Regions:
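Positively charged n-region of N-terminal signal peptides that target proteins for export
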Residues: 1-7
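Short strand-turn segments of transmembrane beta-barrel domains in outer membranes
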Residues: 52-54, 77-85, 323-325
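Outer-membrane beta-barrel porins/channels
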Residues: 22-48, 90-342
Length: 342
């Protein structure tokens, strides 16, 4: 009873934090009004193939993205995930965690972008000035999670977020928080998380420096005073997730996981993700799902994937996962993950 009360208190704090930080009308989506939008890209081919319905599953190293409480019961290991995004943009995600027993588990993750050079164009040189520029996006986090009881875990994932485009950059600190609760109902797990709760970002740098003439009508003043243009503050893409996962008892040869997540983001309408995974003999898995149910004008829809896992020796295991995500009129997305448990 005490554990349940603790869980309810934590969940109430999480929900209260996100709702107080997200006061907007339901008829306004606020799409495109946040910085560091790469933080909203699903990480982990397995999770993405399940329609991104993973907050209550969160049982591999990508849990640091979905629900940091998940690493409390995840074995030691690392994962590498590559996402081939639109316009030849790629995103890499590396995460790993170590279980320290009764004192909890710690983990680290790094998300980075791979974006090629682009031409610098101006009004007078629409075909390019001869210069090129690029951009980079990075998020680094250190997570901690602990299993407070056999049925309840909580996790925290502080992170540093950085974006740069040409000679301008911005950074911010943020945190993800999550809980997992194994309910009294056989095979049902409840998960909740809040992601990217933190500072706003503001672009600063050399491109904002200009030469200013305070009195252009006068010839006696200095018309080349160095000045810096002011830029605005932009919030991170705050997101609240709550979900259920159900794993029926099918014996040792077969494993089935069904999951559903509801999302309340700060820069879009609410939506629902659903997905499932079937695994045969702990070796071969097939996955499918649908993301953004009930979301207006969403291009992202169904996802499919598969994975293989091989136990090498003792606790050492290797796994590889693939995911395909349909994006409607946009280019479809593909993800590949490689993981090692030890």
């Amino acid at each position: 009873m005490k554990t349940l009360s603790c869980g309810i208190l934590v969940l109430s704090i999480l929900f209260g934090s996100v709702t107080s930080a997200q006061q907007f009308k339901s008829d306004v989506s606020k799409k495109g009004t946040t910085a560091a939008s790469f933080l909203s890209i699903s990480q982990g081919a397995r999770a993405a193939a399940m329609g991104s319905a993973f907050v209550a599953v969160a049982d591999d190293w990508s849990a640091m993205y979905w629900n940091p409480a998940g690493i409390a019961t995840t074995p030691n290991g690392v994962t590498f995930d590559h996402t081939q995004w639109f316009a030849d943009i790629g995103y890499n995600f590396v995460a790993g965690s170590v279980n320290l027993g009764s004192i909890g588990a710690i983990g680290m993750s790094l998300t980075s972008s791979t974006i090629g050079d682009m031409k610098v164009t101006t009004v007078n040189a629409p075909d390019g000035t001869g210069e090129v520029f690029n951009m980079s996006q990075v998020a680094f986090s250190v997570a901690y999670a602990i299993q407070l009881t056999d049925n309840f875990a909580i996790g925290f994932n502080p992170k540093f977020v950085y974006e740069r485009i040409w000679k301008m950059s911005a950074n911010a600190m943020a945190i993800d928080m999550g809980v997992k609760y194994r309910t009294p109902f056989d095979g049902i797990v409840l998960g909740m998380s809040i992601s990217n709760f933190g500072q706003k970002m503001r672009m600063t740098g050399q491109n904002a420096v200009v030469l200013y003439d305070a009195d252009p009508a006068s010839s006696a003043n200095n018309g080349r005073v160095p000045a810096e243009m002011s830029t605005g503050d932009w919030a991170l893409p705050l997101n609240f997730r709550v979900g259920l996962a159900y794993q029926p008892s099918l014996g040792d040869m077969h494993r089935l996981v069904l999951a559903v997540d509801a999302m309340h983001p700060s820069d879009d309408y609410e939506s629902v993700n659903v997905g499932g995974e079937y695994t045969f003999d702990g070796f071969l898995s097939f996955r499918g799902g649908y993301k953004a149910l009930f979301l207006k004008e969403s291009e992202e829809s169904f996802s499919l994937g598969f994975g293989i896992r091989q136990q090498i020796m003792g606790h050492l295991s290797l796994s590889a996962d693939y995911c395909y995500v349909n994006f409607g009129r946009l280019n479809d997305i593909q993800k590949i993950s490689v993981s090692m448990g030890f």
